[in-house]
Amino acid sequence: MQKLIIHGGKPLEGSINISGAKNAVLPIMAASILTNKLHITNVPKLTDVSTMKDLLQNHGACIRIIEHTDALEIIINTTNINKFTADYEIVRKMRASIWVLGPLLTKYGKAKVSLPGGCAIGARQVDLHIAVLKSMGAEIEIEDGYINASSKGRLKGTHFVFDKVSVGATINAILAAVLANGETVLFNCGREPEIVDLCYCLIKMGADILGVGSSTITIKGKDCLNETSYKVLSDRIEAGTYMFAAAITKGDVKICGIDYNIIENIALKLIETGIKVVQINNGVQVTYAGMLNSVDLETNPYPGFATDLQAQFMSLMSLSRGVSMITENIFENRFMHVPELCRMGADIVVRGNKAVVRGVEMLKGAEVMASDLRASVSLILAGLSTNSKTVLHRIYHLDRGFQDLEKKLSNCGADIKRV
């Protein structure tokens, strides 16, 4: 099994180009079911993208992939969809697989989707997905680990209030509503940039969507959607990760190819710690300015601080001056990186959904193991900060969400290699 070997202690200097957003391209790929042909560009080279490709092909889609140096171009033809079951063997690899549920159900009136997998962080229940689809007239049962859904005729427009903000359920609801009969109004929706990007793609396909980027989205269902091409937005989570990498290594890095508006909350949090962050053309420049102060953090739905950056921020706070309190409000069981950081000398105590982080002068290299995607990269950041060797095991998690990570870091001076 592959592992990463990191010799830390080298400030990162240079520039990093940000790849397409995984959390945008996956629902956009699922949206291809709603039309006959979808041409997607700026697609990141990730195993999760390959898994979604396999899933769509399993349903009968014909997919052509054109590989470029920094991205993929994917052309999806869904005119021959002929299978409506998303099998466990594919779905278990990635929880985003559940996003084929809404499109299959709204276009074909039936779908059978295995309960999803992905990172082992919390229950991530599908109750809200099911509730909103039922409100559109779907008949749904869970049997033998599968969501069995059907509808008599077209789904119907509905008014639905999400009990809590859910990115996944918001996406499934939008994907179902664009072909439903009548008007759907969704309240307490997720506002994440990736949801906005999906909506822009659907609008380009001919969907009628109002309130994009707000907590209330109104959708007037269409009989069909058009073929189109679409460029996926850049990945704010990848950008934030490299911003923290620059800070933790006391470096100076330009993060390029990202809209500042979608990473401003990350930039402001870094500035609060004493790191210098300057908006530049097409990105930001992050520079260590001689100090790193402890600050508290709470994860919340966008525009709050992303849960997908919590682990990386914790690595940074492990070396800060003072004590910080990190509160995880999105997922339970998302502190699995803490024992591994403590193996590297971090002083962290977990109390329920809170972690108390007391900054130490230096972390030390160790053999550590990744438990999930974001935890794995937090350990890489920790390893880059040390003056010794770190070995990271179970790095297959990384390939789900970070394209060319070793190359991008190495180009900025990091000593990191995969063996």
From Swiss-Prot:
- What EC number(s) does its UniProt record assign? 2.5.1.7
Q: PTM 2-(S-cysteinyl)pyruvic acid O-phosphothioketal: at which residues?
A: C119
Q: What is this protein called?
A: UDP-N-acetylglucosamine 1-carboxyvinyltransferase
Q: Which UniProt keywords apply?
A: Cell cycle, Cell division, Cell shape, Cell wall biogenesis/degradation, Cytoplasm, Peptidoglycan synthesis, Pyruvate, Transferase
- Residues annotated as binding phosphoenolpyruvate are K22, N23
Which HAMAP family does the record cross-reference, listed alphabetically? Answer: MurA
Q: Which family does it belong to?
A: Belongs to the EPSP synthase family. MurA subfamily.
Q: Which is an annotated Pfam family here? A: EPSP_synthase
Residue sites binding UDP-N-acetyl-alpha-D-glucosamine per the record: R95, K164, V165, S166, V167, D308, I330
Q: What class of enzyme is it?
A: transferase
> Matching InterPro entries, A to Z?
Enolpyruvate_Tfrase_dom, Enolpyruvate_Tfrase_sf, MurA_subfamily, RNA3'P_cycl/enolpyr_Trfase_a/b, UDP_GlcNAc_COvinyl_MurA
Where in or outside the cell it occurs: the entry states:
Cytoplasm
For this chain's UniProt record, which GO biological process terms are given? Answer: cell division; cell wall organization; peptidoglycan biosynthetic process; regulation of cell shape; UDP-N-acetylgalactosamine biosynthetic process
- Annotated function: Cell wall formation. Adds enolpyruvyl to UDP-N-acetylglucosamine.
Gene Ontology cellular-component annotations? cytoplasm
What is the species of this protein? Rickettsia typhi (strain ATCC VR-144 / Wilmington)
Active site location? C119 (proton donor)
**Catalytic reaction equation(s):** phosphoenolpyruvate + UDP-N-acetyl-alpha-D-glucosamine = UDP-N-acetyl-3-O-(1-carboxyvinyl)-alpha-D-glucosamine + phosphate
Q: Which SUPFAM superfamilies match?
A: EPT/RTPC-like
Single GO MF descriptor: UDP-N-acetylglucosamine 1-carboxyvinyltransferase activity
Pathway in which the depicted protein is active: Cell wall biogenesis; peptidoglycan biosynthesis
